[in-house]
């Protein structure tokens, strides 16, 4: 396929209107509603704010499209199962050309010169043209294509020198400052459900409970209105025993070998502590069950103090509030707290109600204890951005992403924030389409890390790993850097 500029001589007229390639970046460039103005002389702070805001906005915009639009995998392009789509070879060439010449020149060479339709070009960047646009003029696909082009152009590019399992093992042995980014997939072998796996994930279970949006259970507004929704499923994600998976043990092994820079975990189960990973080596991006705080008085306790209530499906209440309520009940009547509002009193007086019957006094209730996990609508801990941008980014020499689909901002943008020359390995059951990793190791996380350790000559001791375990590793057809791990015996 010819992706070169028009032949020498008179160029054909450009089509109008052109794809607005910057459209996907407009929202990112707008100032945040509550953003503090940039102060001169505070370079580190302004850098953190601008980086974090841009990443957050970009991923939210992209996630909306990914939720609404069906994505195309490269294997579907390879197998030709999508009518009217690019072949995999064409798609790869389009992507390569985009990164070679930039967005503006790429649009001129393709859409502006009619070398390919916008509808077909969307498929090169992994987007299935939506059915509601079927029959529409090609210009109707331009906004969608603008998002696809901007997203692809911003993607980290794979390092061509890293492809094989041996390459992964060599990186593991030679690296000294490894960032490990983990998700729910590293805890599923312990019986803790993940969030997104079809039929088995936690979100699927919540859909069966009749929630409009499974994410509502982790929405801070919903929690404030009805904490019972969260506590109805909290027992399913609560770590009940001091166990840890082989993958947690692998992270501990990296620490013991002096190779672990930081474990950024999206998990809230705090199992890393069970494995012996030091607190100073962990950033709990979404908080954890390790502690809990009263939503009324901010009294903080160790998380295990509310475990019994959670296991029973009860809403844990603040012991400090209960103590204060009990003390208040012993005070003379005149010292009790009255209602703040006077309007209710006036309304009752007008209607002839007796306001001296004790209804003027509020009925005290203890506050609800909320585990210190980060709900949707709450800010991530400051430590996340501060450590990533001002400490780890300049030190890291290898990134290993394990057991996460990288769907939630801003953690999902960590691979793209780090220097592009740093090698990155992805370990999970299925590959991700929106991030380019250098090596994809597909399969059960525990199986993959145990085999990596075996090949590296490291001893990963764990009761869940059979000493006689044999693992078959097979390459994925059409992908030189993608490998599947399966236990064979």
Curated annotation (Swiss-Prot):
Protein's UniProt keywords contain NAD: yes
Region (Disordered): 1-56, 327-370
Start and end residues of each Deacetylase sirtuin-type domain: 158-459
Binding site for Zn(2+): 294, 297, 318, 321
GO CC terms, sorted: chromosome, subtelomeric region; mating-type region heterochromatin; nucleus; pericentric heterochromatin; rDNA heterochromatin
The keyword tRNA processing appears for this protein: no
Manner of cofactor binding, per the entry note: Binds 1 zinc ion per subunit.
Principal location class: nucleus
Cofactor: Zn(2+)
GO molecular function: histone H3K14 deacetylase activity, NAD-dependent; histone H3K4 deacetylase activity, NAD-dependent; histone H3K9 deacetylase activity, NAD-dependent; histone H4K16 deacetylase activity, NAD-dependent; metal ion binding; NAD+ binding
Active site positions, chain numbering: 286 (proton acceptor)
Binding site for NAD(+): 183-203, 266-269, 403-405, 428-430, 445
Location within or outside the cell: Nucleus
InterPro entries: DHS-like_NAD/FAD-binding_dom, NAD-dep_sirtuin_deacylases, Sirtuin, Sirtuin_cat_small_dom_sf, Ssirtuin_cat_dom
Domain of life according to the entry: Eukaryota
Entry-linked PROSITE patterns: SIRTUIN (PS50305)
Catalyses which reaction(s): N(6)-acetyl-L-lysyl-[protein] + NAD(+) + H2O = 2''-O-acetyl-ADP-D-ribose + nicotinamide + L-lysyl-[protein]
Chain intervals with Basic and acidic residues compositional bias: 344-353
Keywords on record: Metal-binding, NAD, Nucleus, Repressor, Transcription, Transcription regulation, Transferase, Zinc
Gene3D superfamilies in the cross-refs: SIR2/SIRT2 'Small Domain, TPP-binding domain
Enzyme Commission no: 2.3.1.286
GO process terms (BP): heterochromatin formation; siRNA-independent facultative heterochromatin formation
Its job: NAD-dependent histone deacetylase, which could function in telomeric silencing, cell cycle progression and chromosome stability.
Assigned protein family: Belongs to the sirtuin family. Class I subfamily.
Name of this protein: NAD-dependent protein deacetylase hst1
Organism field: Emericella nidulans (strain FGSC A4 / ATCC 38163 / CBS 112.46 / NRRL 194 / M139) (Aspergillus nidulans)
């Amino acid at each position: 396929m010819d992706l070169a500029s028009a032949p020498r001589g008179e160029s054909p007229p450009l089509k109008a209107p052109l794809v607005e390639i910057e459209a996907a970046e407009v929202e990112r460039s707008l100032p945040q509603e509550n953003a503090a103005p940039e102060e001169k002389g505070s370079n580190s702070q302004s850098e953190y704010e601008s980086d974090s805001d841009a990443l957050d906005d970009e991923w939210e915009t992209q996630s909306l499209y990914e939720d609404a639009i069906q994505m195309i995998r490269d294997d579907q392009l390879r197998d030709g199962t999508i009518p009217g789509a690019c072949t995999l070879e064409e798609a790869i060439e389009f992507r390569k050309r985009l990164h070679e010449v930039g967005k503006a020149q790429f649009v001129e060479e393709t859409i502006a010169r009619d070398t390919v339709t916008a509808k077909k070009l969307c498929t090169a960047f992994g987007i299935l043209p939506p059915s509601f646009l079927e029959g529409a003029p090609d210009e109707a696909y331009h906004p969608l294509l603008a998002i696809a082009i901007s997203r692809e152009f911003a993607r980290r590019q794979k390092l061509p020198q890293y492809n094989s399992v041996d390459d992964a093992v060599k990186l593991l042995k030679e690296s000294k400052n490894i960032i490990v980014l983990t998700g729910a997939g590293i805890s599923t072998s312990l019986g803790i459900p993940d969030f997104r796996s079809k039929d088995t994930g936690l979100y699927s279970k919540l859909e069966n409970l009749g929630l409009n949006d499974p994410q509502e259970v982790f929405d801070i507004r919903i929690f404030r209105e009805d904490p019972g929704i969260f506590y109805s499923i909290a027992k399913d994600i609560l770590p009940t025993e001091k166990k840890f998976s082989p993958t947690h043990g692998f992270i501990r092994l990296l620490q013991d070998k002096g190779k672990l820079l930081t474990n950024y975990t999206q998990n809230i189960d705090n199992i890393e502590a069970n494995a012996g990973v030091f607190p100073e080596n962990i950033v709990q991006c979404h908080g954890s069950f390790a502690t809990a705080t009263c939503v009324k008085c901010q009294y903080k306790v160790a998380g295990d103090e509310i475990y019994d209530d959670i296991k029973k499906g009860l809403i844990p209440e603040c012991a400090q509030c209960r103590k204060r309520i009990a003390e208040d009940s012993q005070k003379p009547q005149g010292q009790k707290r009255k209602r703040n509002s006077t309007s209710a009193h006036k309304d009752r007086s007008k209607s002839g109600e007796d306001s001296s019957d004790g209804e003027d006094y509020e009925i005290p209730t203890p506050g609800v204890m909320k585990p210190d996990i980060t709900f949707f609508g709450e800010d991530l801990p400051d430590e996340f951005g501060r450590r990533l941008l001002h400490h780890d980014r300049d030190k890291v020499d290898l990134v290993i992403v394990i057991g996460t689909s990288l769907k939630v901002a801003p953690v999902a943008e960590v691979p793209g924030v780090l220097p592009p020359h740093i090698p990155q390995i992805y370990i999970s059951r299925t590959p991700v389409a929106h991030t380019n990793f250098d090596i994809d190791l597909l399969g059960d996380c525990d199986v993959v890390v145990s085999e990596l350790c075996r090949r590296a000559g490291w001893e990963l001791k764990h009761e869940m790993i059979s000493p006689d375990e044999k693992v078959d590793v097979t390459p994925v057809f059409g992908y030189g850097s993608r490998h599947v791990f399966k236990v064979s015996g």
